[in-house]
Swiss-Prot record:
Enzyme class, UniProt record, top EC level: transferase
A GO term, aspect molecular function: 4 iron, 4 sulfur cluster binding
Major place of residence: cytoplasm
Source organism of this protein record: Haemophilus ducreyi (strain 35000HP / ATCC 700724)
PANTHER family in alphabetical order: LIPOYL SYNTHASE, LIPOYL SYNTHASE, MITOCHONDRIAL
Name the record gives this protein: Lipoyl synthase
CDD domains reported in the protein's UniProt record: Radical_SAM
Cofactor remark from the record: Binds 2 [4Fe-4S] clusters per subunit. One cluster is coordinated with 3 cysteines and an exchangeable S-adenosyl-L-methionine.
One Pfam family named in its UniProt record: Radical_SAM
EC number annotated for this UniProt entry: 2.8.1.8
Length: 330
């Protein structure tokens, strides 16, 4: 087949997905052909500022992984191939990914597996709480795959997880990084009202012009509405959102999205560089230099964001505890 930009790609035959099987890379993008991905494309060379020095001691990393495995839990750090895994695990922090490791969406920027997920584990909220207790965490981030197969899109499971963590760890602060609860926004917020988090996070990811390409199945206005409705219900709880750059957007478009976030009551922001997980994902169109991230941070301050973490390796949950305290993260 030929893509919209005229490059030839290998046609992959459609197949029937099996429940509980993780589909990644070519298998993931062949479920519905992603026309703007060419696995034979020439990749941009990483600049010096994008190179990571790995730690020599992995004891802390192994300890975090063991704690996850022991309770049958998942971290988005591993499932999404986050470049900060070694730094965060060595710092003693991890972001728990609940509701399994199989997503019902197939966003071509994301390395989380796609497929037909298994039923929810009703004991998972308690397992997360016990792991938080074992690891003596004072700040924890809970995120999830998209679960469009669930009537409430997983809102009750989020609420149960917050409740169990608080019950076992009353001093622990909980940030939730939620999906868009497609078509169930008001229902989801009503459910979360029973056990609200300390920080509410939902990522817009990029600019509306590129949404069909980057976030198939999502809607820019829905995501803004979710952030707005939550803030209206919980005016004293910080709301947060994250953006990736380097996917073909302009700086002016990113600044416009930042203003949209402020107009919808969002008080915390993260902006980081998109990194291509494999040749079967969206290509990095450019590496944004550190000076431009500093510009985003400066403009965010002018717009009235209470905290903005902007830098090449910044991710939503990167040093989330420090972000919540208002400390500089970049």
């Amino acid at each position: 087949m030929t893509t919209a930009i005229g490059k030839k790609t290998t046609k992959l035959e459609p197949f029937k997905m099996e429940r509980g099987v993780k589909y990644r890379d070519a298998a993931k993008t062949s479920v519905i052909q992603v026309r703007n991905i060419d696995p034979d494309q020439e990749l941009l060379k990483k600049p010096e500022w994008m190179k990571i020095k790995l730690p020599t001691n992995s004891a802390k990393i192994d300890s975090i992984k063991y704690g996850m495995r022991r309770h049958g839990l998942h971290s988005v750090c591993e499932e999404a191939s986050c470049p900060n895994l070694h730094e965060c695990f060595n710092h003693g922090t991890a972001t728990f990914m609940i509701m399994g490791a199989i997503c019902t969406r197939r966003c071509p920027f994301c390395d989380v597996a796609h497929g037909k997920p298994l039923p929810l584990d009703p004991y998972e909220p308690r397992k997360v709480a016990e792991t938080v207790q074992d690891m003596k965490l004072k700040y924890v981030v809970i995120t999830s795959v998209d679960r469009d197969d669930l009537a409430d899109r997983g809102a009750a499971h989020f609420a149960a997880t917050v409740r169990e963590i608080k019950a076992l760890n009353p001093e622990c602060k909980v940030e939730i990084l939620v999906p868009d609860f497609r078509g169930r926004v008001e229902q989801a917020v009503a459910i979360l009202k029973q056990n609200p988090p300390d920080v509410f996070n939902h990522n817009l990811e990029n600019v509306p012009r590129l949404y069909r390409e980057i976030r198939p199945g999502a809607d820019y206005k829905w995501s803004l509405e979710l952030l707005k409705i939550f803030k209206q219900e919980f005016p004293n709880i910080p709301t947060k959102s994250g953006l990736m750059v380097g996917l073909g957007e302009t700086n002016e478009e990113i600044l416009a999205v930042m203003q949209d976030l402020r107009d919808h009551g969002v008080t915390m922001l993260t902006v980081g560089q998109y990194l291509q997980p494999s040749r079967h994902h969206l290509r990095v169109e450019r590496y944004v230099p550190p000076a431009e991230f500093e510009m985003f941070r400066s403009e965010a301050e002018k717009m009235g964001f209470e905290h903005a973490a902007c830098g090449p390796f910044v991710r939503s949950s990167y040093h989330a505890d420090l972000q919540a305290k208002g400390e500089l993260v970049k």
